[in-house]
Amino acid sequence: VHAFRRRYRLSARESQITELILRGSGNREIAQALGITVMTTKKHLGRIFDKVGVDSRSQLMAKLG
């Protein structure tokens, strides 16, 4: 995940969210784990998708490969 973070210039929070996605966490679980709202989680996910150039979690997971 660290090389992925550097390659796509993800923030520390975006990297945390990416790690939780890899573990299979949903938006509610991510929000609870990080002490943020579900809406904030969705905003971070949108930024991650934009930076990586994907439209879905499955595409993100495929890029993380």
Range-by-range predicted roles:
Residues G24-Q59:
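Recognition helix of helix-turn-helix DNA-binding domains
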Residues I21-S25, L64:
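Short helix-to-turn junction characteristic of helix-turn-helix DNA-binding domains
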Residues V1-A12, R28:
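Linker/hinge segments immediately adjacent to helix-turn-helix/homeobox DNA-binding domains
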